[in-house]
C-alpha cells in the first residue's frame, strides 16, 4: 500500500502543479494582452505568489484550508452581484 500511496501522491502533486502553472500563465497572458489594468509590480507579485504555491503545497503534511476553491467561488458570486448592481462603473 505505501508504494501505491506514494505514486498517487506524486500524480496529485503533478496535477496540482500543472493547474498552478496554468493559472499563473493565464494571469500573465491577460496582463500582457491588456486585460488587467494594474501595475507591472502588482501583476508580478501576484504571479509570483501563485507560482510559490507549488512549493508551499509540496511542504505541507496536511491539506491547506482553501484548496477546495470555496473561497474563490464565493468571491466570484459576491463580485457578480456587485457587477449586476453596477459596482464596476
Q: Across the structure, where does each feature detected by a protein language model lie?
A:
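Intrinsically disordered, low-complexity polar regions and short flexible loop motifs
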Residues: 1-89
Amino acid at each position: 500500500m505505501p508504494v501505491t500511496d506514494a505514486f498517487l501522491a506524486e500524480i496529485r502533486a503533478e496535477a496540482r502543479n500543472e493547474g498552478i502553472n496554468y493559472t499563473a500563465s493565464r494571469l500573465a497572458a491577460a496582463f500582457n494582452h491588456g486585460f488587467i489594468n494594474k501595475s507591472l509590480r502588482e501583476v508580478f507579485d501576484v504571479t509570483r505568489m501563485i507560482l510559490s504555491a507549488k512549493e508551499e503545497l509540496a511542504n505541507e503534511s496536511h491539506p491547506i484550508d482553501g484548496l477546495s476553491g470555496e473561497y474563490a467561488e464565493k468571491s466570484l458570486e459576491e463580485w457578480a452581484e456587485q457587477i449586476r448592481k453596477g459596482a464596476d462603473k
